[in-house]
């Protein structure tokens, strides 16, 4: 009784220390006596097998009223003797053993009984002879993992290991029950304290047992809640006496890194067509994996008892070790004297040789690198000079060779680094970089564009969608009034025309207030002249909805006439354009309306914007707060995607779609992100041109 009283005093002091510290204690911080006490008072202390710590269960304790002890469940730190027995086991690897799983504990150790190993000779008879002189342990001496001798009523004796305390502890010490696993027979039972005796001379070192410590291949730790489920499966297998005696054929791959556990795998003990390791991983779950374990065999391979391939057999392993030892000895011997490669003299000689001739070995490679670098710099200078001389962005077309076009790297870098500002307040450097990059996309010769356009028109195998995209690009330049005002606009699509138009295009208003949704007039062979009701004849060129082959409401002109007209218009645009963003030409037939009366000017604007045959539209811009830089970037990328779709260049198309999606993820502003999402949807719709 005095021993139990002393344990309670120590337990109360430990609980007070943990409560004051407000943290659990590592098991290594505690001495052997404190570890012994914490393992017995599971009602006060909680053990975490994954962190190897003891924590105080928050509750009210009174020193005057002792709390009865109760042993916790066995853990991996309590089976040191069984691990030594496993390390000394004479087992060939890999090989099959007929085992019976007995119990599973955290973090992950399965106690498995080897049915093929016999009981040590003469041990049972010796224990029966020594039974009358055996001493019983007290309740204060019982801890999980301790090995005792269980004495049956027929005087037969069996060695067993304590798993945990079973049943109610509100009984006398002699009637307390403990769940034990036998070391020499596959059995797990609950026994009373009065039937247990000290081990004496029948230790595992003297008489090795057949109970081994194992773990499933590829699994280092199981989930904390899965321990009870796994033990439930083992109990289902264990209750069948036929299965318990016959066991299951398990493949023993090898011992683990520490050498005290067997890495095994076997068909599912529940009868499913899965291995035990695969069932834990895929069906129930695990906590962590063992990366250094060998590759597990499949269920069929385990059933057919196949052995895994081994790279180095046992016969050659010693040779490899001898070679490694000789190499190490040679390296250690070479460190003496001036022959050491790290000697100061050798280091100085090496540095001096590198100073004298640093590039002789790779001079050719360096020359090629410098040449490529110089050519790239020259190309950039020429491009800058050409842009300065002629700031007009030219329409771009793919060459006839069909080269892969990708979006300029600088645009991708700017998008990835988030240098485009959504609120429109960017620095001048950002504005200049975006302007130059957008010009580089469209800096090709007009004559080549017109020729490629003519070839695309004459090619009979060109698809309808590709023709539509080509027509929009080649006919996207027309005369505009000199005084214009650019305001944003919403996305407008002609439902009867399948040609994809920019989702956010600027609305351009002239001095009279006239506007149209596309940002610039698209010339067409079908022009009409209409006079206003005021009597002052103002001739306006209107577009007759002939931009696409699919939704055209009027007859299309011939390809030859359209091509010739486009060539003449492009040449005229190249010679007289001065606007960097919009290509404008003064129209002779557009009269000035400044001297008109206000009533006639308002009536003219009304008829132009709401007339039945007029193709213009005025709308409130939903994305007015989106910066011009982002709009320009989106328009440039979509124009480039039209070219890739027209040239059937799917690789460049996919790459630039991916670039737009990546830019969208970098945008913090929700309005700008929604704007760019619509642009991405519009860009993806251009993929129909590949069909």
Curated annotation (Swiss-Prot):
One of its GO terms (cellular component) is perinuclear region of cytoplasm. It is found in: Cytoplasm, Perinuclear region. Residues 549-573, 588-598 have a biased composition (Polar residues). Changing residue 159 to C: Progressive fertility defects at 25 degrees Celsius, with animals becoming sterile after 10 to 11 generations. Expressed in the cytoplasm of germ cells, but does not form germline foci. Inhibits piRNA-mediated gene silencing. It comes from the Eukaryota. One of its GO terms (biological process) is siRNA processing. Residues 547-573, 588-618 are annotated as: Disordered. Signal peptide: none annotated. Residues 139-204 form the Tudor domain. Keywords: Cytoplasm, RNA-mediated gene silencing. Tudor domain specifically binds peptides with symmetrically dimethylated arginines (sDMA) and may facilitate protein-protein interactions. The Tudor domain contains the conserved arginine and aspartic acid residues, which play a structural role, but lacks two of the four conserved aromatic residues, so it is unclear whether it is functional to recognize a methylated substrate. Acts downstream of piRNA production to promote mediator complex-dependent endogenous siRNA biogenesis from piRNA-target mRNAs in the RNA interference pathway in germ cells. Not required to identify target mRNA by the piRNA pathway. Plays a role in both spermatogenesis and oogenesis and in maintaining fertility over multiple generations, probably by directing mutator-dependent silencing to piRNA-targeted genes. This is Protein simr-1. It comes from Caenorhabditis elegans. The gene is simr-1.
